[in-house]
C-alpha cells in the first residue's frame, strides 16, 4: 500500500467511539477524510407548528433541527493528535442539514467554506481542504467555473495539500471540473503542492469489485492523461446497510470488497492509494426508532484467505410470559432473554469460527469480544458493536497491508 491508509470518517457517534479506542500508534498511520455530517436531531425538533414532521426537503432548509455545531466540534477535537487529515462536507442528503447546505454554498468562490476551513486551522488543527462542487441551481457554466477556481485559489495560497472527492460511480462528467482547474493544478504542483483525487465508489456490493475496478482503471488513465501523476485514492465500502442484504439471518461471511477493488486497480496503476469507510455503510440508520427491539449481532473482520467480514446474530429467546394490560384488556406477553445473554452467545460463536477468527493484538474491539464471551458484555447497544467492528476493521487493514506499527 502506497503511503497512509485513508479513512473516510462520517462523524457518527459509533465512529468517534471507534477512533477514540483505536491504539494511538495505529491512529498515527491513518489519514482521515473527515466528512462533517448533521449530528443528532435535537429533542422535539423537526416538526411544524402543528407538530407534523417536516419533509426531507423542509429539514434541509430549517436551521436548528440537528446538533451540527456540537458534532463538528467533537469530531474535529477527536482529530487533534492527527499529523494531518482532510476536511470535507457530506454529500449524502440524509446526513445533511440547513447549516451544512449554507456552509457549502458556492457564492463568492465558496467563501463560507474557505473561511470555515481557515478558521479551524487557526485553532491548531492540522487539516487540509477538500474542494466543494456545489453550484447554485441558476449558475451558468462561467459562474460554476469561476467559483470553483476562486475556491482553489484561496486554498492553494494557504495549504500544500488539496483534495477533490468525486462519487465516481455517479458523476461521469467530473473531468470537466479537473480540466477547468488544470492550469491552477499544474501551477500548484509545480510549486511543490500535492493534489489528491479521491475516487469515492461509496457502497460496492461484495462480488462486484471486478466490474468497478475495470471502469475505475479507465477513469484513472484519463485522469493521468490530462493531469499527469496526481495522487489518486481509491475509496469504497462493502459493508451493507443490513447484513441480510448479502447474507443469512443468523450467520454469514462476505469479502471485504474494497480491498479486492483496490488490488485489482493497482495491477494497472501501481501508484494508487487505498481508502475505505472503516466498515461503515454510507447510509446511517440513526433516525430509525426501534420499537420491537433488535437481534444481537457481533461482526468480525478477518485476514484469513484475504479480507472477509463475518457475523453471528441471534433472535432473542422466549423465557417466559407475563400478564399485561393494553387499553384496559389483559393480555399475555412473552418475556425475552436479556440482550446480554445473546451478546455473550454470539461473541462465543465469533471466537469459535476457525480459522477465520484471529486474536488482534492491542485491539480494543477484540478485547470487547473476548470480554463479552466471558460474560462481561460491554454494552447492549448496537452502536457499541458497530464501534467494535470498525476498530477491528482498521487494525486488520493495517495488518493486511503490512503497515501496522504494533
Regions found by a protein language model. Give the residues of each.
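Eukaryote-skewed repeat-based solenoidal scaffolds used as protein-protein interaction platforms
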Residues: 113-293
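Alpha/beta catalytic barrel-like cores
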Residues: 1-127, 135, 234, 241-406
Amino acid at each position: 500500500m502506497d503511503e497512509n491508509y485513508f479513512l473516510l470518517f462520517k462523524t457518527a457517534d459509533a465512529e468517534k467511539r471507534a477512533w477514540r479506542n483505536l491504539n494511538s500508534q495505529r491512529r498515527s498511520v491513518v489519514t482521515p477524510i473527515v466528512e462533517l455530517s448533521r449530528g443528532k436531531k435535537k429533542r422535539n425538533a423537526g416538526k411544524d407548528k402543528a407538530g407534523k414532521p417536516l419533509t426531507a426537503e423542509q429539514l434541509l432548509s430549517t436551521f436548528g433541527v440537528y446538533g451540527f455545531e456540537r458534532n463538528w466540534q467533537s469530531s474535529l477535537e477527536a482529530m487533534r493528535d492527527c499529523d494531518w487529515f482532510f476536511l470535507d462536507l457530506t454529500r449524502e442528503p440524509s446526513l445533511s442539514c440547513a447549516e451544512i447546505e449554507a456552509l457549502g454554498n458556492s457564492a463568492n468562490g465558496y467563501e463560507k467554506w474557505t473561511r470555515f476551513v481557515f478558521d479551524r486551522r487557526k485553532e491548531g488543527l492540522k487539516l487540509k481542504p477538500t474542494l466543494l462542487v456545489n453550484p447554485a441551481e441558476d449558475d451558468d457554466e462561467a459562474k460554476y467555473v469561476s467559483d470553483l477556481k476562486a475556491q482553489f485559489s484561496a486554498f492553494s495560497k494557504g495549504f500544500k495539500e488539496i483534495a477533490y472527492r468525486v462519487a465516481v460511480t455517479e458523476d461521469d462528467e467530473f473531468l470537466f471540473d479537473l480540466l477547468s482547474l488544470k492550469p491552477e493544478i499544474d501551477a500548484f504542483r509545480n510549486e511543490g503542492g500535492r493534489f489528491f483525487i479521491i475516487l469515492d465508489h461509496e457502497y460496492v456490493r461484495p462480488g462486484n469489485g471486478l466490474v468497478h475496478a475495470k471502469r475505475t482503471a479507465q477513469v484513472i488513465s484519463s485522469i493521468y492523461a490530462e493531469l499527469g501523476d496526481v495522487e489518486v485514492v481509491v475509496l469504497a465500502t462493502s459493508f451493507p446497510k443490513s447484513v441480510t442484504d448479502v447474507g443469512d439471518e443468523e450467520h454469514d461471511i462476505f469479502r471485504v470488497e474494497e480491498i479486492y477493488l483496490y488490488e485489482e486497480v493497482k495491477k494497472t496503476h501501481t501508484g494508487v492509494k487505498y481508502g475505505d469507510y472503516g466498515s461503515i455503510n454510507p447510509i446511517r440508520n440513526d433516525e430509525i426508532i426501534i420499537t420491537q427491539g433488535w437481534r444481537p449481532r457481533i461482526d468480525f473482520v478477518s485476514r484469513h484467505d484475504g479480507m472477509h467480514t463475518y457475523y453471528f446474530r441471534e433472535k432473542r429467546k422466549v423465557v417466559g410470559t407475563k400478564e399485561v394490560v393494553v387499553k384496559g384488556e389483559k393480555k399475555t406477553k412473552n418475556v425475552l432473554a436479556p440482550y446480554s445473554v445473546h451478546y455473550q452467545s454470539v461473541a462465543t460463536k465469533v471466537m469459535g469460527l476457525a480459522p477465520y477468527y484471529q486474536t488482534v493484538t492491542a485491539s480494543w474491539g477484540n478485547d470487547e469480544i473476548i470480554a463479552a464471551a466471558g460474560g462481561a458484555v460491554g454494552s447492549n447497544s448496537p452502536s457499541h458493536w458497530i464501534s467494535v467492528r470498525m476498530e477491528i476493521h482498521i487494525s486488520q487493514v493495517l495488518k493486511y497491508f503490512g503497515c501496522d506499527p504494533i
